[in-house]
Regions:
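Conserved P-loop NTPase "ATPase switch" module shared by AAA+ and STAND
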Residues: 124-140
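Long, charge-dense
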Residues: 64-111
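Glycine-rich P-loop/Walker A and Walker A-like loops and their local beta1-loop-alpha1 context
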Residues: 1-56
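Short acidic, S/G/P-rich loop/turn micro-motifs used as interaction or catalytic elements
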Residues: 38-43, 72-74, 105-110, 135-139, ...
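Mid-core helix/loop region of P-loop NTP-binding domains shared across ATPases and GTPases
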Residues: 111-123
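Residue-level preference for the first positions of well-ordered beta-strands
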Residues: 29-33, 128, 158-160
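A short acidic (Asp/Glu
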Residues: 42-48, 75-80, 139-144, 170-174
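Glycine-rich, aromatic-bearing surface loops/beta-hairpins
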Residues: 142-191
Length: 191
C-alpha cells in the first residue's frame, strides 16, 4: 500500500467512533504510531493540515488537536529567553551538552514533563491528539520517551504519533537509521 492509501486508511480509521473509545486493542491505552518514509514528510504534513482544516469546519463530533513537539520546545526556550544561551552553550560545550541541558530544563525524562503537561492542558475532552515534529526534535527529544511519559499521564483520548521512520510495534527506527529504545504499547496505524 502506498503512502496516499495509508493516509486515506488512517483518516477513515480515526473517524470511526470505535477508534475514539478510551482503550485500544486488548485493553491497552489508545496510542498509535503512523510511520512513513522520511522523504514523504511534506506529504504527511499536508494531509494533517487538510484533516485539521476539515475538522475545524465542524464536520466531526470530535476535535483534532495537533501538537508539533519541536514548536513546543522552541516556544519554551523563547519564553525562558534561553535561545541565545543555547546557541552559546552549544558552541562552547557541544551538541551533547545542549541536548542534556534542554532535556533537563524541560524535564523530558519525567512523567510530568513540560511537554506532557502542555499537551494535557491544551487538549479538550472529545479529541484525537496528533503528535508531529518528531524528526525535527531529534536528538533533544526521543520518541519512545514521549510515548512512555504521555502514556503514564494522558489516557483520556487517542494519541497518534506521526513518525518519520519505521515502527513494527516493537521498535522505533527514526529516519530508518536510528534505533530508539524498544516501545511496545502503541499500535501501528494503517499498515
Amino acid at each position: 500500500m502506498d503512502l496516499s492509501q495509508r493516509l486515506d486508511e488512517m483518516e477513515l480509521a480515526i473517524h470511526k467512533p470505535s477508534f475514539r473509545k478510551g482503550t485500544g486493542r486488548a485493553n491497552e491505552v489508545n496510542y498509535w504510531v503512523f510511520d512513513y518514509t522520511p522523504e514523504k514528510e511534506l506529504e504527511v504534513r499536508e494531509r494533517i493540515e487538510y484533516m485539521k482544516n476539515k475538522n475545524d469546519r465542524g464536520d466531526d463530533d470530535f476535535e483534532f488537536v495537533v501538537f508539533d513537539l519541536y514548536d513546543i520546545i522552541i516556544d519554551f526556550l523563547k519564553k525562558k529567553s534561553f535561545m541565545e544561551k543555547c546557541y552559546d552553550f552549544e558552541k562552547k560545550r557541544g551538541i551533547e551538552r545542549i541536548v542534556k541541558a534542554v532535556s533537563n530544563s524541560m524535564k523530558v525524562n519525567d512523567d510530568d514533563s513540560l511537554i506532557v503537561r502542555y499537551i494535557k492542558e491544551h487538549t479538550p475532552e472529545n479529541a484525537v491528539v496528533f503528535l508531529t515534529g518528531i524528526g525535527k526534535c531529534y536528538p533533544i527529544l526521543r520518541s519512545h520517551k514521549v510515548l512512555n511519559n504521555l502514556h503514564q499521564a494522558f489516557v483520556r483520548c487517542p494519541v497518534v504519533m506521526f513518525f518519520p521512520g519505521t515502527y513494527n510495534e516493537q521498535e522505533l527506527i527514526l529516519f530508518n537509521e536510528i534505533k530508539d529504545d524498544n516501545y511496545y504499547r502503541a499500535f501501528r496505524l494503517a499498515k
